[in-house]
Amino acid sequence: MIVDDIQVGNGRTGTFFSFERAGIKPDMVVLSKSISGFGMPMAILLIRPDLDIFRPAEHNGTFRGNQLSFVGATAGINYYVEHSMDKVVQRKAKMISDFLESEIIPLNKNLSYRGIGFIWGIDFNAIDSTLALKVVHKAFDNGLIMEVAGRKDGVLKIMPPLTIQDDILNEGLNVMKESIVDVLN
């Protein structure tokens, strides 16, 4: 089994690997994007030891690593461990889910949401899938960068940085709500 943890690994779901809560033991895990710690280019393929056929230095090449990315990854992983980011993400995830339940869902009975950790989506498909992109544009006008995902790009994606401060998270959620209200009206 190969797990794609490119977007949802590195603490995004509240555990370092997204599959931990399911008790899965993958053969391979693919990581990139946030593994470098601050956006430097980096990708890693983790392989179960009994499947790894390469000896040290056997699998290499001219473009085998970006040293700055390695330093960033080390610092990012150390920060994650030292600051118990799994607990931080889980606490702030509750802030997000509580906000969605109390402030967003009451705006329209056809809205729904789903997510875990620091990756959530508000589904506009039951109303009109084009509304999600309109919210993205309105949010941008209001100073918040968001994106869409899902079928017909009808899901508004919520993916704050793991290190976001509580007050900034609340500010972003309120800007998102204001943008949704503007689009729905």
What are these language model-derived features?
Residues 1-185:
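Conserved N-terminal phosphate-binding loop of PLP-dependent enzymes in the Aspartate aminotransferase
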